[in-house]
From Swiss-Prot:
Top-rank taxon, per record: Bacteria
Residues in the signal sequence: none
Annotated GO biological process: DNA replication; DNA synthesis involved in DNA repair; double-strand break repair; SOS response
Keywords: ATP-binding, Cytoplasm, DNA damage, DNA repair, DNA replication, DNA-binding, Nucleotide-binding, SOS response
Classification via PROSITE patterns: RECF_1 (PS00617), RECF_2 (PS00618)
UniProt protein name: DNA replication and repair protein RecF
Compartmental location: Cytoplasm
Statement: the UniProt record of this protein carries the keyword Acyltransferase: no
Highest classification ranks of the organism: Bacteria, Pseudomonadati, Pseudomonadota, Gammaproteobacteria, Pseudomonadales
CC annotations in GO: cytoplasm
Pfam families registered for this protein in UniProt: SMC_N
Residues holding ATP: G30, A31, N32, G33, S34, G35, K36, T37
GO molecular function per UniProt: ATP binding; single-stranded DNA binding
Source species: Pseudomonas entomophila (strain L48)
Family: Belongs to the RecF family.
Length: 367
């Protein structure tokens, strides 16, 4: 799948614009602060109804404007098109529309427009808190396991009930036991989905990483959030007093993590910033391969500031891997010359110059 048309209104400093991107490679170039990243942010809003630059959406809305809007026409893998739109008002009203109908949740957008982001903050996947890695893991599971979302919602409901009981003691013994059973059942299913996903991801990740950088001894493992040799109901029973003291459940899928190690050390403690970025790129490209294997569509990759912390050899290797995915890519850079010639002759490449929020297409992929 790919964006055939993208219309952006009142996002950051961007002037209202409608773009016709290439189904493959799109390079946005211009000076720092010109608005290149805001274009990627607009696509991110369209696919996830949130920004990757700010947890608050008010700063995304252009100064003196009350609403920002992003519209996209998506070419579907199975043929045909679908129209997606998101708008956000300063007062907080968020509207999501799919083919003219109001959508129930952002998950519907995410399912139709799977996005992968690679930017200067990508190293946080290794250095950041376990929550960041759980989000990465569950993005992948969501896109390859149709049962994941419903099970995840069951898990969250059971976890909220148990945590409320731990803090306030509002459940009788029978209700508490019932919610504990539901929590354990949903947790076992989530754990199974995650384990199966990591089993499929690891060989693809290792193969992809080997094409980017040599890191002998790097391992990827999955921690499910509780002792692998014990059932969750047993762990919950033995940790009940501590859970009550803490006011929340200490064990379960909500504590899961991905662990990347180099020998006996955490990879983030050993690798340079450039090496960390290559590891993250390999992880995200591997995810794209799995999505294409399970679904008929491809991810769309948003790559912000590609040259950052990568030398020419590694930039070219990354571009080659993205090209081999046969997916749509949006890349930002200051100077496009080193990127423009790095693709196969038959690969459609479109160039967009961004200057003070104005976007001009300087090379059409159809030329």
């Amino acid at each position: 799948m790919s964006l055939r048309r993208l219309s952006v209104t009142a996002v950051r400093n961007l002037h209202p614009v409608t773009l016709s991107p290439s189904p493959r490679i799109n390079i946005l170039y211009g000076a720092n602060g010109s608005g290149k990243t805001s274009v990627l942010e607009a696509v991110h809003l369209l696919g996830l109804a949130r920004s990757f630059r700010s947890t608050r959406l008010n700063p995304v809305i252009q100064y003196e404007q009350q609403t920002c809007t992003v519209f996209g026409q998506v070419e579907l893998a199975e043929g045909g098109t679908s129209n997606l739109g998101v708008s956000r008002e300063r007062q907080g009203e968020f509207t999501i529309r799919i083919d003219g109908q109001n959508a129930r949740s952002a998950a519907q957008l995410a399912e139709m427009l799977p996005l992968q982001l690679i930017n200067p903050d990508s190293f946080r996947l290794l250095e950041g808190a376990p929550k960041v890695r759980r989000q990465f893991l569950d993005w992948g599971v969501f896109h390859v396991e149709p049962r994941f979302m419903a099970t995840w919602q069951r898990l969250q409901k059971a976890l909220r009930q148990r945590n409320s009981w731990l803090r306030h003691g509002t459940l009788d013994a029978v209700s508490q036991a019932a919610w504990d059973r539901e929590l354990c059942l949903a947790s076992a299913e989530i754990d199974e989905y995650r384990r199966n996903y990591i089993k499929a991801l690891k060989p693809v990740f290792e193969r992809t990483l080997s094409e980017l950088v040599e890191l002998d001894g790097l391992t990827l493992s999955y921690y499910r959030g509780w002792d692998k040799d014990r059932e969750l109901n047993e762990v919950l029973a033995t940790s009940l007093l501590r859970d009550q003291q803490m006011g929340h459940t200490q064990a379960g899928p909500q504590r899961a993590d991905l662990r990347l190690r180099l020998g006996a050390n955490n990879a983030a403690d050993i690798l340079s910033r450039g090496q960390q970025k290559l590891v993250v790129c390999a992880l995200r490209i591997a995810q794209g391969h799995l999505v294409s294997q399970v679904r008929r569509g491809q991810c769309i990759y948003l790559v912000d500031d590609l040259p950052s912390e990568l030398d020419e050899q590694h930039r070219r290797a990354l571009c080659r891997l993205l090209e081999e995915l046969n997916c749509q890519v949006f890349i930002t850079c200051v100077d496009h010359e080193f990127l423009r010639e790095g693709w196969q002759t038959e690969t459609p490449v479109a160039l967009f110059h961004v200057e003070q929020g104005r976007i001009t297409q300087t090379h059409d992929h159809r030329e």
